[in-house]
Structure formats: C-alpha cells, structure tokens
Design a protein with these regions (language model features):
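Helix-biased detector of long, well-ordered alpha-helical tracts
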Residues: 1-128
C-alpha cells in the first residue's frame, strides 16, 4: 500500500503427481506478469504434499517495494474524509476463491483478474 513494487517472493505447495506442464505454465505466467509490473521474483520455495493433501497447487507470495521519501503509509493513518480508490468490485476476489474451493451448490460466473495495479497508480506515486 503506497509503495512502488520491486520484489516478489513465492512459495509453492504442490500436490504429488501435479502435472509438470501445468506447473511450467503457472511459472511462465508469473514471470510474464512480474516483467509487465517491473517486479523481480527474487526468492522461491517448494514443498510437495502427498496425494489428496492439497488441491493441486497453492502459491503464496510476498511483495516488497520502495516507499517514497517523506511519505508515510499505513491503514492506521486513514481518517474520516479520506478518499478511497476502489479498482474493482469489493469482495469479488474472495467470492471467486470461495466458489472455486468449496461446494456451495451455487453456479455463478464470477472471476477475479488479480491484475498488477502499478501502471494505473504510478502517476499518483511519482513526485510532482
């Protein structure tokens, strides 16, 4: 929040027997998106879980960035009257994940793009 993205770490938990081609496809998509966002993937970790212990693959990422000098960021600094910029439907991503992971018996066409936002917000970050 409020930082120029620079680095990304990732950890994979991969189910035994997960297709290597699918893993390569995921890694290639991560590489492409990182390049588009101007971010370097600098660290990674993999663990293999037994068949049936995970649903295919779980990926956890951590992003690190640069905060412009003299700028303070943090949710605790929010106050009444501040502007909040929303880049999509509130709750869409969480709803998408829940529908993909759980069997609620609901048929809904809900997707989440998880797109990098730096290109859209960097004008706000750059000094005048």
């Amino acid at each position: 929040m409020g930082a120029k993205p620079m680095y990304l770490t990732c950890a994979f938990v991969i189910e035994e027997g997960f297709p290597m081609e699918k893993l390569e496809e995921i890694a290639a998509a991560m590489e492409k998106t990182a390049k588009e966002a101007g971010v370097r993937i600098v660290s990674g970790d993999t663990k293999v879980a037994g068949k049936g212990q995970v649903d295919g693959v779980f990926i956890t990422t951590t992003g690190m960035g640069e905060i412009r000098e003299g700028v303070q960021v943090g949710g605790e600094l929010a106050k009444p009257g501040d502007a909040i910029i929303v880049t999509g439907d509130v709750g869409r991503h969480g709803c998408t994940i829940l529908l993909a992971r759980e069997d609620f018996g609901i048929d809904a066409d809900v997707t989440s793009d998880c797109a990098p936002l730096w290109g859209a917000v960097k004008e706000c970050w750059m000094p005048p």
